[in-house]
Amino acid sequence: MIHPVQVGKRTRMSFSKLDEIGVMPNLIEVQLDSYQWFLDNGLQEIFDDINPIQDYTGNLILEFIGYKLDMDNIKYSVEECKERDTTYAAPLKVKVRLLNKETGEVKEQEVFMGDFPLMTEQGTFIINGAERVIVSQLVRSPGAYYDYIVDKNGKKLFSATVIPNRGAWLEYETDSNSVIHVRIDKTRKLPITILVRAMGFGSDAEIVNYFGEEERLKATIEKDNTKTREEALLEIYKRLRPGEPPTVDSAFSLINSLFFDPKRYDLSRVGRYKFNKKLAVSIRIANKTAAKDIVNPETGEIIVEKGQRISKEKALEIQNSGINSVDISVDDNIIRVIGNNFVDIKSYIKFDISDLNIRELVYYPVLKEILENYTDEEAIKEQLKKNVHKLVPKHIIKDDMFATVSYELGLAYGIGNVDDIDHLGNRRVRSVGELLQNQFRIGLSRMERVVKERMTIQDQEVITPQALINIRPVAASIKEFFGSSQLSQFMDQINPLSELTHKRRLSALGPGGLSRERAGFEVRDVHHSHYGRMCPIETPEGPNIGLINSLATYAKVNEYGFVETPYRTVDKEQGRVTDEIHYITADEEDRCLIARANEALDENGYFIDKKITVRAPDEVLVVPANEVDLMDVSARQMVSVATAMIPFLENDDASRALMGSNMQRQAVPLLKPQAPVVGTGIEHKAAVDSGILPKARNAGVVEYVSANEVRVRRDSDGGVDTYRLLKFKRSNQGTCINQRPIVEKNEKVEKGTVLADGQSTDLGEIALGRNIRMGFITWEGYNYEDAMLISEQLVRDDVFTSIHIEEYEAEARDTKLGPEEITRDIPNVGEDALKDIDERGIIRIGAEVRSGDILVGKVTPKGETELTAEERLLRAIFGEKAREVRDTSLRVPHGEAGIIVDVKIFTRENGDELPPGVNELVRCYIAQKRKISVGDKMSGRHGNKGVISRVLPEEDMPFLPDGRPLQICLNPLGVPSRMNIGQVLEVHLGWAAANLGWHIATPVFDGALEPEIVECLKRAGYAEDGKTVLYDGRTGEAFDNRVTVGYMYILKLAHLVDDKIHARSTGPYSLVTQQPLGGKAQFGGQRFGEMEVWALEAYGAAHTLQEILTVKSDDVVGRVKTYEAIVKGENIPEPGIPEAFKVLIKELQALCLDVKVLSDNNNEIELKESIEDETEDLDVNIEGNEDSKVEPIRPQDVQENVSGENVDAGYENEDVDIDYEDLDIDDLKNGLGLEDFNDEH
């Protein structure tokens, strides 16, 4: 069965039994298509909605008549935007017309409406120099939803919710007395008949006449205390506006504005589509029995006779003939079914109206009126165009309301069905385009208010469109969306797969969505409608589980925002599966029986078996072959891209597969990537669609190749396409982006051919890790609890070495005392520290730096200080004016080191755009080569993660009979309880494939079976069980048992020990408690908490305990004195009073308790009020500020840090690695001499 398959430049041996019928769509089209829709249609829709803006007298009219994005005037390219920290955007120019009705004067102008962020080819945005992704949001679709609860007597009480896109909700509920109530916009409930009366049915008789005789309706009428339309209107007004004097007119206008004003109530296209689907007569009466003859009102012919069953086809005919009310009999009851009076326009109009953009059902009364009054084709078209908002109303109409009430009444008799809110037919995706459109609409409506105000204020003669329009609110709302919306996220750029997954993510969180706290289990659960649309595996662990999902591989989002998945259609006449593919939404799928992708077919597409296993909505059935409706396109159609990259996924437990999918996204790009020997065949598609590989724009011949660029001569016109390659750029997460050409000179390339490899790709396939020779064997306890034992060879040969690039920036600002200056001339710095600094004061490229080294020399003017008498004397003698500056150079932070790979300088003089107050900005990029080391986290693709516990010399590793040592030893106990057996199969197949020199593709759910793996092992000349004798590298003796050995694909994850390890001696302290801050980012200390204190108490270590609670924590004076004593080599003094104790006393004083502190002999101990009092006599400052005394901290120096502690702002800008070596110890011993009074000290 194994056969070669060509993927890009590599041939893989595939175990797939299925021919791929459907082509996988472009994996980031969710982003690209949605943004394109916004530019083509979305913007126009908003302008149409807001047109025209009139002033309050109706005299001035402002209209937007067209717009264009000025693509020729884009200021910077994508690369330049990243360098300069600007937004990649194009100016939006809008054509505006202002009409003055009095004078008839028309003014037209093109108005600039701000820069509009553009999407890059990769589906991302560059905002302020950072690459961001707009995540698609899964929200409840507008529509009518029905549900029921069972009361204590076992009776079903039905309820309904009518949800618009924006506007007032309607909620129906039934109480145990069978009275149906309605809540309008979450107010108090009213009997539903009051709403019906207010809509036009005044008397009880009219209501019963319209809706038919029904028990619950009668019960509700009895409860209803209004009898006329006017009373009903007043009753509703009292509920909605309590406390205001009710009048019929105000009630009428209130209801009109609540429901029938398109600006206040918007169903959106989706809402209208869902309404028409739910409330249509046809679906509700299909397969029911007619209670009366059903007659076509136009022709008078009988469509269905009394007592006949109404078929699906007849039901559609009834609906489209304009019949809106049908009586059907259910168990001797006659129930009236009322629809919302929408028909298919195609059954009335035979000529082509595709250019009118009417794709929904249309409102019958309006259509009927047009067709009665006009006969000419052109006139009809003209009228349809004119009345398009009446034919397809954006707001709710009375017929919708009556239909929802009728549906509620019919549910008790089994007419219609209740809805499942977690069904993907009832949840839709809001992608970039729609989110942007909503945001833009907010900005425009704010602008509309401003325009109306300006129309009334300004002189109507001289007014121009430009003067009326204020673009600030529009620009602000767009900026706010991209900068701070929950759905605009900093792109996850660790490797190409994480980028791709981020763009395909579906989030139920965000504005208008759920919140983590309120989301229950049902929302997070896997639902049968997710099949082929959302991945059941890939979702985060933790509080967001199930709320953030990933789009399945073949899924698409349709124009309404519903997720569709492709199926092959089954020709029922012939009973064969065709190659025709249909994309189907979740609610359409519910009516079908669907066969698996790997169901056996003969060469003509007929089912081989008589009985076929199929998926019905939420169960698996076995049916005869002739009943199957559809068939899956591919075995991997139900999972996402990351999950489809796990070989033998079918043999892994789901929770481990989830970890595997998530951890692949954290794999760091390695120095030498290697495509997996055992892949799944999707690696190439994922790499190409992720957008990190340069692809040929046109067919041609490669003319020139270097490390930096590739040139291709086009076949079409002989011109040359040049492709610049990225070299050692920093990604959002600090990993390294680097491209290497993979084509040769004179090579022929087609359009779309991959020209170069990027980070984590190998020959155009995604390559996140390395193929490693490993064995499942315990070794001296070093792989206890998932630890890994690795060979020194992995370190020596740079197998798991990755490059990380960090960016540091220094800015020279204007201060109150004068401008800061970037210079080489820094006070108190020896020539040795400046050896790599050039004459401008900036480090040279290629220099090797360690923590504490200067990157950019910078001095800040100091305030004039009061001079002492000695200093004044010295000044008078030597006549030297002090240089009053202090060193504020940018230095390499603690624990960082590396090589300078790039320096960028931006200055005001060169015309670079800099933030206000900044004159010069310098950015340095430091690259580190990180070899694999103890403490690094690694994993396979099956959720088998571990931490490196020991690096063993190569000669000590267990070795094979042919002398090759293993590279990694894994614990065999990590497999059985975790049930991820896929890793074992991968190891066996990799063992065979490596020997045969194959690369293998084993697609998920359609991969290699056990007999095939055994066959491969035999072919490679290995034992069938994949085990081999291993020898101990230390003694050379064989181990007692044979061991499973093979090749496993192993990833190095982004949790590197170098980023986590951290130590502090002294550093910044919290302002209030005076305790050291916490965490590596703040250069904090280790927390010694309550339980640790108990441990010392239990041990009786009194002195250690006292020291930890005072001088090592918040005894301000004690810690300075202790430090002095250590420096001078004296004994450590007694601890003082910790700050926490003073805070406690202050709290007691706040409770009006007078607390005094007494010593042993009853003398009162005086507590100094503030830090300044205490530290007056100290001449060492261990917070690392320049001046020897601890300055009182000014409020503006304090900034909030993340954990809610206060951090001294000086810490951010100044160097906090206090180098105590610099302190001159002799001074402390000897007192001060005259030479100490020069300005540098």
UniProtKB/Swiss-Prot annotation:
Gene3D superfamilies: 2.40.50.100, 2.40.50.150, 3.90.1100.10, DNA-directed RNA polymerase, beta subunit, external 1 domain (2.30.150.10), DNA-directed RNA polymerase, subunit 2, domain 6 (2.40.270.10), RNA polymerase alpha subunit dimerisation domain (3.90.1800.10), RNA polymerase Rpb2, domain 2 (3.90.1110.10)
Taxonomy, superkingdom: Bacteria
Residues covered by region (Disordered): 1195-1219
UniProt-listed GO biological process terms: DNA-templated transcription
GO cellular component, one term: DNA-directed RNA polymerase complex
An example Gene Ontology molecular-function term: ribonucleoside binding
Entry EC no(s): 2.7.7.6
UniProt keyword Transferase, yes or no: yes
Enzyme class: transferase
Family annotation (InterPro entries): DNA-dir_RNA_pol_bsu_ext_1_sf (IPR042107), DNA-dir_RNA_pol_bsu_external_1 (IPR019462), DNA-dir_RNA_pol_su2 (IPR015712), DNA-dir_RNAP_su2_dom (IPR007120), DNA-dir_RNAP_su2_hyb_sf (IPR037033), RNA_pol_bsu_bac (IPR010243), RNA_pol_bsu_CS (IPR007121), RNA_pol_bsu_protrusion (IPR007644)
Pfam families: RNA_pol_Rpb2_1, RNA_pol_Rpb2_2, RNA_pol_Rpb2_3, RNA_pol_Rpb2_45, RNA_pol_Rpb2_6, RNA_pol_Rpb2_7
Reactions the enzyme catalyzes: RNA(n) + a ribonucleoside 5'-triphosphate = RNA(n+1) + diphosphate
Keyword Transferase: yes
Function: DNA-dependent RNA polymerase catalyzes the transcription of DNA into RNA using the four ribonucleoside triphosphates as substrates.
Quaternary structure annotation from Swiss-Prot or TrEMBL: The RNAP catalytic core consists of 2 alpha, 1 beta, 1 beta' and 1 omega subunit. When a sigma factor is associated with the core the holoenzyme is formed, which can initiate transcription.
Family: Belongs to the RNA polymerase beta chain family.
Protein name in the entry: DNA-directed RNA polymerase subunit beta
Organism: Clostridium acetobutylicum (strain ATCC 824 / DSM 792 / JCM 1419 / IAM 19013 / LMG 5710 / NBRC 13948 / NRRL B-527 / VKM B-1787 / 2291 / W)
Gene giving rise to this polypeptide: rpoB
